[in-house]
Amino acid sequence: MKKTTYLLILLCSLLCTACVHSATKAALGKLVGSDRDEHGCIPSAGYTWSYALHDCVRLWEAGMRFDSGPQQIFLVYSTDSTFAEIFPTEGKSIICKRVKSTNSWKNKKGKESVYINNGIVCVKMNDFTYTQKK
């Protein structure tokens, strides 16, 4: 009787240990921050790829916020100010190239543009002009 009880307890212990191990393994497979995009950025940590900066950035840290329009957008300049990159709330970012000897950047494919008017940064996108808050 003691041997049977001992074997039953041993069997239950092994089963419980196996269940805990598989649950732990499943949890480790989905760690926060383990997701990476094609550029190596971690979206769950707030990072997105910037073509203007050629780096993973957090938009609220590296960019200028514009929320005076129908959607919130962010603007990031390249280090040499050759490019301005617009990040809309939805969709892909939009690259605008600087027009020589001016304070304006234009997108070749669309109507989007960035310009500085009397020291105020303006972003024109989807027939709406976003202005920087002071």
Specify the residue positions occupied by each region the protein language model found.
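Residue-level signal for mature regions of secreted extracellular proteins and peptides
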Residues: I9-C12, S34, W49
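C-terminal motif of bacterial Sec signal peptides marking the signal peptidase cleavage site
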Residues: L15-A18
